[in-house]
Amino acid sequence: MEQIITEFISRFGYAAIFILILLENVLPIVPSEIILTFAGLMSVKSHLSILTLFIIATIASFIGLLILYYICRLISEERLYRFIDRHGKWIKLKSKDLKRANDWFKKYGVWAVFICRFIPVLRVLITIPAGVNRMNVVTFTVISLIGTTIWNFGLILLGRTLSDSFGMLMTGLHTYSRIMYVVIIIAVIYFAIRYIGKRKRVK
């Protein structure tokens, strides 16, 4: 996957960034941490402008997240889970990941949308419960764009700054992703235990 993405960017430049980032905001199978850090690297070693990369990535993110948001507004939560159970394997999406994003959204609302924009996979999945639960589109868009703008600029700048250590950078990003998954799992277990404890006390 990584090699395909980097070769695609090397060959098609800005157009590749736009297509990949748009897809990344609709499907969680295209990792933006690879796309944008490599784009930052290419801004050093080619004619690509860091400002143009940032603008293109932000516009593509905006279009992609709104596409997914409006799709999810049209379907119920039950139908969504049934679809993921049947077809999720083709887009590397599991019901438990979606449930995690949904639980975060219902518990934290706007803050969940903002914070999840900095967490691989969940940064895409959080759009689904926002759409299904019909979160105000203006609020959703503003919060998402703030988080996405910070994420995009940070990764592009990181790739540009550490262009001489790209291999080490990719390893570090993979480690970050794994750590975030562990943190999320621990948080879910913690809140589940608290919820069960409260129900037992009520009984």
UniProtKB/Swiss-Prot annotation:
Membrane topology: Multi-pass membrane protein
GO CC, alphabetical: plasma membrane
Highest taxon above the source species: Bacteria
Localization terms from the record: Cell membrane
Record keywords: Cell membrane, Cell wall biogenesis/degradation, Membrane, Transmembrane, Transmembrane helix, Transport
A single GO BP: cell wall organization
Pfam families linked to this entry: VTT_dom (PF09335)
Transmembrane segments: 16-36, 48-68, 108-128, 137-157, 173-193
Knocked-out gene: effects: Deletion of the gene does not affect sensitivity to the amphomycin derivative MX2401, which binds UndP in the outer leaflet of the cytoplasmic membrane and prevents its recycling. In another study, the deletion mutant exhibits moderate acid-dependent amphomycin sensitivity, but sensitivity to other antibiotics is unaltered at any pH. The double mutant uptA-popT is growth-impaired and exhibits cell size variability, and 10% of the cells have membrane permeability defects, consistent with impaired envelope assembly. The triple mutant lacking uptA, popT and SAOUHSC_00901 is not viable.
Key word Cell membrane present: yes
Major localization class: membrane
Matches recorded under InterPro entries: DedA_domain (IPR051311), VTT_dom (IPR032816)
Functional note: Flippase that catalyzes the transport of undecaprenyl phosphate (UndP) across the cytoplasmic membrane, from the external side to the cytoplasmic side. Is involved in UndP recycling during peptidoglycan synthesis.
Similarity section: Belongs to the DedA family.
This protein's name: Undecaprenyl phosphate transporter A
Organism encoding this protein: Staphylococcus aureus (strain NCTC 8325 / PS 47)
Lineage: Bacteria, Bacillati, Bacillota, Bacilli, Bacillales
